[in-house]
Structures are given as structure tokens and as C-alpha cells.
Amino acid sequence: MQREVYVSITGLRVRRIWHIPSFWSLATKAMVQARSAPGNISAETRTIDGVHHTRSVWTDKAAMQAYLTTGPHLEAMRRYPTIAKGKTVGFLTTEVPDWAQVHAIWVEMGRDV
């Protein structure tokens, strides 16, 4: 049996074209933070149908939550409502979804944030 990991999937759409520079500045800093955060196994991005997605894999939910509430990601969450809209979903699994699955899971199970 494989080890269980926590997968977090986000999908965000920038509200207005003039928000793009702020969005990418915040997103880039948050991704750098994620990739070096304790408990992070992987963190990747893709744009699918104009939606900016992330898929991050963590040793456990606590590691993801520690990242979520500190540093650049916390700043991004504070600014998020004014520059973007989207959905997130997180779950425990023994199989990390591929990108086709990521998008389907996000569409089906994502909750508005």
C-alpha cells in the first residue's frame, strides 16, 4: 500500500485584466514559498481554459495548513478577493491525480472561495 498524502487543488481566474500583474506577483511568491515549505512534496501550476490552477502535494494536511497561513501565501489570501475568484479542494489520497484528473476534480468538487 502506498503512503497517504494530502493534495490541494486550486483554480483561480483574474477578475480584470489590470489585476494580472498583481496576481502573478503574489502567485509567484506563494509558489516559491510552497516549494520550500516543510512537508511539501511537489507544487505545480497549469492554466486550463483561462483558469490558473495549482496542484500541491503534502505529507499531511497540517503541513499544507501551516504553509497556507504564513508568509507570501497569507498575503495572497488577503488580497485574493479583490483580484481573483475561484475554487479550491483538498483531500487525502494514495494516488496523486494527473492534470486531466485535477481539472475534473476541481470542476466537480471545488468549493467557491
State each model region's role.
Residues 1-51, 65-66, 87-113:
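Short S/T/G/P-rich N-terminal loop/turn motif that feeds into the first structured element of a domain
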Residues 55:
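Ligand-binding pocket scaffold of soluble enzyme catalytic domains
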Residues 59-90:
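An amphipathic, aromatic/His-enriched active-site/gating alpha helix that lines ligand/cofactor pockets
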